[in-house]
């Protein structure tokens, strides 16, 4: 039986998570709901047509205010308060928190209060149980004690794996890095 996923925030990250699940984890993960302040029609259009990554290869339709992707209904909600999203009623195992708003674990916990079993925050977080960078410290994850985890930042995910290889093989005494980042809505 597939792990049920809910996505809170259907912007760039939320849509890419959705596409990755559809294209690579079909039968293993299943997106059962999204929560975004845009309506289903707008979310369907943004999922289907992407000027950076191209068109979504499957079918995307709207029926009764929900998305229908490749024939499967995905519930659509437009709640500002995560505690009001019926994750528990939908049997959601994991919520991907990708709004950029609920990055403090005390706020992200509202998803669990609404019935989700775990939360993955797609940004740097405060008070999370663990920050995970795949290929660097993902072996530290313990499902018995890590319920709200952060996926770190895009910069960390780019730099840390390469730095780990260099450090493990030759050592790093000092380091400096810089990043150029597109404008975001919290700047």
Name every feature range the model reports, one short phrase each.
Residues 1-187:
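N-terminal Rossmann-like NAD(P) cofactor-binding subdomain of oxidoreductases
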